[in-house]
Design a protein with these regions (language model features):
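Periplasmic solute-binding protein
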Residues: 82, 127-147, 156, 163-203, ...
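Hinge/lid segment of periplasmic solute-binding proteins
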Residues: 36, 41-61, 127-185, 211, ...
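Short, solvent-exposed loop/beta-turn-alpha elements that line the ligand-binding surface or hinge
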Residues: 58-64, 143-161, 230-233, 248-268, ...
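Glycine-centered hinge/linker elements that transmit conformational signals in sensory
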Residues: 212-218, 255-286, 327, 331
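Extracytoplasmic "Venus flytrap"/periplasmic binding protein-like
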Residues: 82-161, 196-205, 302-303, 319-320, ...
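Short, well-ordered beta-strand elements
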Residues: 63-74, 93-98, 121-122, 226
């Protein structure tokens, strides 16, 4: 239960997508350069004599300060809420939060920034908002805090985050603005019992195998082999459209920052999606995460590709009929290999907040994302971005989905899954509209891709990317 002193606007139980990544889009994803400043040690803080720094001591000047956070109604935020009383007890800082639907969270924060209403101190930054929030000056570069020995925990260890998470979720133009907090990868969730009944000992390793071998055997009696959440909106543009072009060698933009959806490899992924629809529920174009997760949990579909954060719904007997049958694997590979979806959020500090609130907010962000609290955060239902937590044998046994998650982040993570520049929201809307029309058959894949390429180029040209007014950053 939320305390009565918390401000809450309860959203839907399972909310929309989160999404992804960085850098100008090459055909083979390349991780951005490490954002950890060279002039600081691996901790991200200046050297401090042993025993000199403590959270309680660092927080003394801010005792009694209240900070307000933007949270979603998802497992990672409920996990943080469980841990917050410990932070408050140590520091005397009062942490409040407002829970809002994902769909409203960007707009509410932008209105707070532009109106200077100062409602939020601890800012929630989706991977695709980092460019907009940073370039607009709405969030504070975190070196202000991690280079201050009074505020920086000597054990901060920025290099302890999975590099792809810190670089994609929290970094823009080589400057860190947020620390990874709610961390996702796409995972193939499957009903092991349904697969075994159909004669399969393991899930498909490739998309082609899913289509040609698994699809026909698992689609019968009003049950389906696969479901791909595709509702118009961010779910269509990211979870469905972008998820399908990358494994086939496609991309939104090419190495020259030109729209690339009409390339043969991008078209191959979109054509494959059309073909796969015969093994999906007929109304899947209307499905969001909620419908997709429930369909697997209730035994109506055999496989889905979804965010790792939804695992709790499959293991809870109150929400799932397949608790003894749930299986996990890396997302299937295409002709160029596996390119699982990458998504998540970082926590940042509002530039509009007072210096006292900024410092208090930093102390909270540093603590809740720390290596010290990572295991507690995971046990409470969160997904930490800290590498060390996933080496714990007890946690690995308790959470078997760790394996595909860590493999995806470490080996297959695609840092350019979706651009993070400020122009993504209007581009996403266009993809959502045309992508839906493609799936419904009201426009051909080829015509839809041609239309999108022209629209995307117009947006990027108007923004100044081709004139040199803006750097070609994603």
């Amino acid at each position: 239960m939320l305390s009565t002193r918390r401000q809450c606007q309860i959203g839907v139980l399972i909310v929309s997508s989160v999404l992804l990544a960085s850098c100008a889009a090459p055909s083979t994803p390349q991780a951005p350069a490490s954002p950890v400043p060279a002039q600081t040690p691996a901790t991200g803080a200046r050297p401090v004599e042993p025993g000199q720094w403590s959270l309680a001591k660092a927080a003394e000047p801010y005792k009694g300060v209240t900070i307000n956070c933007v949270f979603l109604d998802r497992p990672g935020y409920r996990a943080a809420i469980q841990l917050i009383p410990e932070f408050e007890s140590i520091t005397g800082i009062d942490v409040t939060w407002e829970i809002m639907p994902y769909e409203n969270s960007r707009e509410k924060q932008v209105l707070d920034f532009t109106g200077n209403t100062k409602n939020y101190d601890c800012i929630l930054i989706d991977v695709v908002w980092i460019g907009e929030f940073a370039a607009s000056g709405w969030v504070v570069p975190l070196r202000k805090f991690y280079e201050d020995p009074a505020l920086a925990d000597p054990n901060l260890n920025l290099k302890g985050f999975f590099p792809i998470l810190l670089e994609s979720f929290g970094t823009w133009n080589n400057e860190i603005y947020g620390l990874p907090f709610d961390n996702y990868s796409g995972v193939l969730f499957y009903n092991r019992c349904m697969l075994e009944e159909a004669g399969f000992k393991e899930p498909p390793k490739t998309w082609q195998e899913l289509l040609e071998v698994y699809g026909p055997k698992l689609t019968k009696d009003r049950k389906y082999a696969f479901a791909l959440q595709s509702r118009r909106g961010e779910t269509q543009s990211a979870d469905s459209f972008m998820r399908m072009i990358w494994p086939f060698g496609g991309s939104l933009l090419d190495e020259n920052f030109e729209p690339n959806l009409s390339s043969e490899k991008s078209l191959a992924g979109l054509r494959f999606r059309q073909e796969l629809m015969k093994y999906m529920p007929p109304d899947v174009v209307e499905w969001d995460h909620d419908e997709t997760v429930q369909a697997l949990a209730q035994g109506r579909v055999a496989m889905i590709t979804e965010w790792s954060a939804f695992n709790a719904y499959f293991t809870d007997p109150n929400t799932s009929k397949i608790t003894d049958c749930i299986g996990y694997a890396v997302e299937p590979a295409g002709p160029v290999g596996s390119r699982p979806a990458l998504g998540g959020f970082s926590l940042g500090v509002s530039a509009n907040s007072s210096p006292e609130k900024q410092a208090a907010t930093w102390l909270f962000i540093q603590w809740i994302t720390s290596e010290e609290k990572a295991k507690d955060y995971i046990r409470a239902g969160g997904v930490s971005g800290r590498m060390s937590a996933y080496e714990d044998p007890e946690l690995k046994a308790q959470f078997p989905y760790f394996e595909p998650l860590v493999v995806s982040w470490s080996k297959y993570g695609n840092p350019v899954f979706r651009p993070r520049f400020p122009e993504w929201p209007p581009i996403s809307e266009l993809i959502a509209q045309t992508g839906t029309e493609m799936m419904l058959g009201s426009i051909s894949v080829e015509e839809g891709a041609k239309r999108l390429d022209a629209q995307i180029r117009e947006i990027l040209e108007k923004a100044g990317y081709y004139s040199g007014a803006k750097p070609k950053l994603q």
